[in-house]
């Protein structure tokens, strides 16, 4: 008797094995940038070989630390029924389309507009569609992510997206919008967040999740297979994730 599922599994493994995997999560380590009102990431060597006979670390962090996903409940008090544990674990297993603006030398407060998204699609020949993930690369992570005394500049300053850009992705019926900044569409200037139409109007109210603080976006192809799972956190406002993208060779 043969296992009827073996063939399908072999096909998936062979397909993924022939693709290039890109790790999209920055390392969780002491000193990484954090939203100012969130606790510092703490990693404590709570159990050691010398003292206890084995090794285990204790970790304390906000749900929105490092690469993470925002659920509607994060920003919307009337959507507390949509915490991260109400979404399927495979919700973020889908194709993703890259919108790469890393060559524009964006400054804090600069906005990506719907016209810029359309122009990029014309240039790349790829358009995000229903059920896919839109990935916007500002070039922010590569330029400003650090873990030293200047780490917080990354979260205190950022470009963002205009309201019509946020509506653009909503109208495409995407599953999620992902970026390499701390707050996706929210531009930040000297620690002051500007408008956040994606969080409050265009995305979260429509169950479009928000993925933030991704790295290595410059390694992506125009379309890739995106895979990430949130932790199964009871009533979670969001969750850290370990996202990867599989790109054609």
Where are the predicted features?
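Active-/binding-site microenvironments in catalytic and ligand-binding cores
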Residues: 1-249
């Amino acid at each position: 008797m043969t296992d009827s599922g073996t063939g399908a599994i072999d096909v998936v493994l062979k397909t993924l094995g022939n693709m290039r995997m890109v790790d999209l999560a920055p390392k969780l380590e002491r000193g990484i940038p954090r939203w100012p009102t969130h606790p510092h990431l703490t990693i404590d060597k709570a159990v050691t070989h010398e003292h206890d006979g084995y090794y285990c670390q204790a970790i304390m962090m906000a749900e929105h630390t490092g690469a993470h996903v925002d659920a509607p409940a994060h920003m919307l008090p009337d959507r507390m029924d949509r915490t991260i544990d109400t979404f399927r674990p495979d919700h973020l297993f889908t194709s993703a389309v890259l919108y790469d603006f890393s060559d524009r030398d964006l400054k804090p407060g600069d906005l990506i507009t719907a016209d810029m998204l359309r122009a990029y699609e014309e240039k790349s020949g790829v358009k995000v569609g229903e059920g896919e993930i839109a990935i916007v690369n500002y070039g922010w992570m590569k330029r400003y992510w650090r873990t030293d005394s200047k780490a917080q500049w990354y979260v205190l300053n950022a470009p963002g997206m205009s309201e019509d850009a946020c509506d653009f992705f909503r109208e495409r019926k995407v599953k999620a919008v992902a970026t390499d900044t701390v707050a996706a569409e929210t531009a930040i200037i000297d620690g002051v967040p500007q408008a956040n139409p994606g969080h409050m109007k265009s995305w979260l109210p429509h169950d479009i999740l928000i993925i933030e603080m991704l790295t290595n976006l410059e390694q992506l192809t125009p379309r890739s297979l995106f895979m990430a799972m949130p932790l199964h956190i009871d009533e979670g406002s969001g969750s850290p994730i370990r996202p990867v993208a599989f790109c054609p060779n």
